[in-house]
């Protein structure tokens, strides 16, 4: 059995977890930085300072809760990209320091791969499988062929989906982060009321675009003073629009997999926006694959997914040098 200490500091969550190869989570510590809420978005400098302030304490807490000593660990893993460079440096340097002192292997984890692989901690998912990764910073379709081996089928050409949710929420006078609020208000709204553009729909490929939808909401919001019901209707219409676009793109992704003679049984929806139950249920209803998603606490950024990815990589002897430099941009299909 292998056991890994994992660190996640790529954005505004400071997180530490201890995970083993028996699929046990021995500790899961996470601190979300509430300072960003009043700023309406993530401020990199604030995020970096918070990581520096809290990371050591979270590591200490995780070790105490797991009843382990550093000598009991088999490796140290950290998210080393993509993400905000300040946070990546802090988390990666801490992991390297622990690895050096304890003489344990260091594993640099790609944040996107961690989102893609965490379902294998929870379910029996075999390679290859289709991935829709939707988060605050990324939106892309992938075929996961193996650990470290991915085919990117398409991605957003402008805003990420999480960014679109947050900007629409801001337009409607809602607080940050906007995703959970939009989903909640949409339950009381009429999703057919406002006609929003379905960008890229019916086109070939799997690329996406959300800037036009964001602009359409802004233009409609300028036309009249919105009541509470108007806001609910707009939230519902926005979600309907997004679900139509994703459904169209998923069908194209399945078609591409077939054309490549890659047999897909599982479709994984992951990333922070995958916490949106409306979108997941809509896709499950219309896609003839085994549709899986992590629970909400493992959709948003966390160290459990980093630890599990570290386990997957350690089992294949994929370890990294202490000279490894954090990568603010690090595409999955260019993993090595």
Curated annotation (Swiss-Prot):
GO terms for cellular component: cytoplasm. It catalyses: L-threonylcarbamoyladenylate + adenosine(37) in tRNA = N(6)-L-threonylcarbamoyladenosine(37) in tRNA + AMP + H(+). GO terms for molecular function: iron ion binding; N(6)-L-threonylcarbamoyladenine synthase activity. SUPFAM superfamilies: Actin-like ATPase domain (SSF53067). Its cofactor is Fe(2+). It is found in: Cytoplasm. One of its GO terms (biological process) is tRNA threonylcarbamoyladenosine modification. Keywords: Acyltransferase, Cytoplasm, Iron, Metal-binding, Transferase, tRNA processing. The keyword Lipid metabolism does not apply. Required for the formation of a threonylcarbamoyl group on adenosine at position 37 (t(6)A37) in tRNAs that read codons beginning with adenine. Is involved in the transfer of the threonylcarbamoyl moiety of threonylcarbamoyl-AMP (TC-AMP) to the N6 group of A37, together with TsaE and TsaB. TsaD likely plays a direct catalytic role in this reaction. This is tRNA N6-adenosine threonylcarbamoyltransferase. It comes from Wolbachia pipientis subsp. Culex pipiens (strain wPip).
């Amino acid at each position: 059995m292998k056991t890994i200490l994992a660190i996640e500091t790529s954005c505004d969550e400071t997180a530490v977890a201890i995970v083993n190869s028996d699929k046990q989570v021995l500790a899961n510590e996470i601190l979300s930085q509430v300072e960003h809420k009043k700023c309406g978005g993530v401020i990199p400098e604030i995020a970096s300072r918070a990581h520096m302030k809290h990371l050591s304490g979270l590591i200490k807490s995780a070790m105490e809760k797991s009843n382990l000593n550093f000598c009991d660990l088999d490796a140290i893993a950290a998210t080393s990209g993509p993400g905000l460079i300040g946070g990546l440096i802090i988390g990666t340097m801490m992991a390297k320091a622990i690895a050096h002192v304890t003489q344990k292997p260091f594993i640099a984890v790609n944040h996107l791969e961690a989102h893609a692989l965490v379902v294998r901690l929870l379910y029996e998912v075999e390679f290859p499988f289709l991935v829709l990764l939707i988060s605050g910073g990324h939106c892309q379709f992938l075929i996961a062929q193996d650990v470290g081996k991915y085919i990117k089928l398409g991605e957003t050409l402008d805003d990420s989906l999480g960014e679109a949710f947050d900007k629409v929420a801001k337009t409607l006078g809602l607080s940050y982060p906007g995703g959970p609020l939009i989903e909640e208000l949409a339950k009381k709204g009429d999703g057919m009321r406002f006609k929003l553009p379905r960008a890229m729909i019916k086109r070939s490929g799997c690329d996406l675009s959300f800037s036009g939808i964001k602009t359409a909401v802004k233009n409609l919001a300028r036309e009249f003073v919105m009541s509470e019901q108007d806001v609910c209707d707009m939230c519902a219409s926005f979600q309907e629009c997004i679900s139509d676009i994703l459904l169209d793109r998923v069908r194209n992704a399945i078609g591409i997999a077939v054309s490549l003679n890659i047999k897909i049984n599982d479709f994984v929806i992951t990333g922070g926006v995958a916490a949106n139950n409306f979108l997941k249920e809509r896709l499950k209803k219309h896609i003839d694959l085994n549709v899986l998603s992590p629970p909400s606490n493992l959709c948003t950024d966390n160290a459990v997914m980093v630890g599990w990815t570290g386990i997957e990589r350690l089992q294949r002897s994929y370890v990294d040098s202490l000279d490894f430099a954090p990568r603010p941009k690090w595409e999955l299909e260019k993993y090595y």
